[in-house]
């Protein structure tokens, strides 16, 4: 069975967020088109997503030195264990849908913490004599991102770092197909905000048939 990991990184729901509204339209249509696929919603603002900190480094160091997982402290086990769970869940999925806003030219920090949890050598990529090689070569990914301004082209395109970062990390993981669906300009042209949102929702529903 095809497994889709629907990853949202926004504190608001679809009634307050443009990206979440478009994401909801996409995933609901996707479920209708693919009723036999398993869709798992991972809300990064509601789930426990550990950050790499002193406990994580300490736990990793102990494991590398040959100690067992049970020999870690309670804090180390909780954090390292959860990161392992997130990584295994990520690897087990066939498709990824990331839904984020653009905040200060990037995305919310909780998504970076999540990426740090799943970027594991030997799991999502490996090191070789020729350099790192991605291991997720049979996956595909989509990024739905809301941007208040216009960043798809022109000088401002160089300032957008959220989608570009995800593109780089997906390539690093070996994911061969990575698409972007952008809702942009609603803050720059507020009188057209509803039209911009409606057009993005329509595109999302269309994309759900082919993703």
UniProtKB/Swiss-Prot annotation:
EC number(s): the record gives 1.6.5.-, 1.7.1.17
Q: Which InterPro entries does this chain map to? A: Flavodoxin_fold, Flavoprotein-like_sf, FMN-dep_NADH:Q_OxRdtase_AzoR1, NADH:quinone_OxRdtase_FMN_depd
Q: How is the cofactor bound?
A: Binds 1 FMN per subunit.
Please tell me which top-level EC class this enzyme sits in.
oxidoreductase
Organism per entry? Geobacillus kaustophilus (strain HTA426)
Please give the Pfam families that the UniProt record associates with this protein.
Flavodoxin_2 (PF02525)
What reaction(s) does this enzyme catalyze? 2 a quinone + NADH + H(+) = 2 a 1,4-benzosemiquinone + NAD(+); N,N-dimethyl-1,4-phenylenediamine + anthranilate + 2 NAD(+) = 2-(4-dimethylaminophenyl)diazenylbenzoate + 2 NADH + 2 H(+)
Q: Tell me its family.
A: Belongs to the azoreductase type 1 family.
The record's annotation in PANTHER family points to: FMN-DEPENDENT NADH-AZOREDUCTASE 1 (PTHR43741), FMN-DEPENDENT NADH:QUINONE OXIDOREDUCTASE (PTHR43741:SF7)
Cofactor(s) required, per the database record: FMN
Q: Which keywords fit this entry according to its UniProt record?
A: Flavoprotein, FMN, NAD, Oxidoreductase
Gene3D superfamilies cross-referenced by the UniProt entry: 3.40.50.360
The record's section on NCBIfam families has: PRK13556.1
Q: What name does this protein carry?
A: FMN-dependent NADH:quinone oxidoreductase
């Amino acid at each position: 069975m095809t497994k889709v990991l629907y990853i949202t990184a926004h504190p608001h729901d679809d009634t307050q967020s443009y990206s979440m509204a478009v994401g909801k339209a996409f995933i609901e249509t996707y479920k209708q088109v693919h009723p036999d696929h398993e869709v798992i919603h991972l809300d990064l603002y509601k789930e426990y997503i550990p950050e790499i900190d002193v406990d994580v480094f300490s736990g990793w160091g102990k494991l590398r030195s040959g100690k067992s997982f049970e020999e870690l402290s309670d804090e180390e086990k909780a954090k390292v264990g959860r990161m392992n769970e997130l990584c295994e869940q990520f690897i087990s999925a066939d498709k990824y849908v990331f839904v984020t806003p653009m905040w200060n030219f990037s995305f919310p920090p909780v998504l970076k913490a999540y990426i740090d949890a799943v970027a594991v050598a030997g799991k999502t990529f490996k090191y070789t004599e020729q350099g790192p090689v991605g291991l997720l070569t049979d996956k595909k990914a989509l990024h739905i991102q809301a941007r208040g301004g216009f960043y798809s082209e022109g000088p401002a395109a160089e300032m957008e770092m959220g989608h570009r970062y995800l593109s780089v990390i997906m390539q690093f993981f070996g994911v061969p197909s990575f698409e972007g669906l952008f809702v942009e300009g609603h803050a720059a042209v507020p009188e057209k905000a509803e039209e911009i949102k409606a057009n993005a929702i329509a595109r999302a529903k269309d994309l759900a048939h082919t993703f």
